[in-house]
Amino acid sequence: MAILVTGGTKGIGLEIACRFAKPGTDVFLNYVTDRVAADSAARRVESLGAKAHLIEQDVGTPEGAQKVLDAVAPVTQRLDQLVHCAVRVMPVPILKVDLHEFTKAININATALLYLTKAALPVMGKGSTVFYLTSRGGRTAVKNYAAVGAAKALAESLVRYLVLELGPRGIRINCVAPSGVDTEALRNVYGERTDQVLQQNALDTPNGRGVVHDDYTALVEFLASPAAEMIQGQVIFVNGGQYLHA
């Protein structure tokens, strides 16, 4: 088995990679910067029995996405899971977003999904799955999250259209939206308010706790299984029912 995770050396991406890291599995971890974190992630994956492959490459361009898949091809002829988790966080008000930076956010958070999927088609086939990691910012307005939120909304729409072309090939694609998970990206958005936000998130769920890594990685594992064959083009939130309150 083989899995490719963009943004796979930290946070949610790394947790998903580790969920699939078993003996005999090739785990491709894409990153852009921070080699120290990448090496640490590779060691963690290999401690679980899998083989880790680090790929340093920006996926925000068609050329970059193709280079990532070019690194996969010599190792395996089949990619079972493609997980696009790379994110460019820009915690600024929308009216202050620089157009160049906004375009980068769209490219990395959204159109990279299309670039990667197209590049991966030669090594994906019946039973392969694609995942896009989204967030509630793609559906609701979150303060200082406009650039990323708009990109997430675009990517969710792309997923629905990709279903029409991937489905006949036997490839499934879905979005998973974990909410309120303590990650570096979340702390970049909320800064010194992060702990307060996490505590409030837990209080707002009917069962009184926040989302932990096992909650969403278990969902991804299920969606990658044959049992989820008829789940296509969905955005599935993992938030403990946080937003059910009137």
Language-model-detected regions and their locations in the chain:
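A glycine/serine/threonine-rich, flexible loop-to-helix segment
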Residues: 168, 180-205, 245-246
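Conserved glycine-rich cofactor-binding loop
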Residues: 9-10
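Short C-terminal tail/terminal secondary-structure segment
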Residues: 140, 221, 232-246
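Alpha-helical segment proximal to the catalytic Tyr-Lys
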Residues: 122, 164-168, 229
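Conserved NAD(P)H cofactor-binding loop of Rossmann-fold oxidoreductase domains
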Residues: 85-90, 241
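Substrate-binding pocket helix/loop in short-chain dehydrogenase/reductase
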Residues: 93-94, 98-106, 197, 201
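Catalytic loop of short-chain dehydrogenase/reductase
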Residues: 131-155, 159-168, 180-181
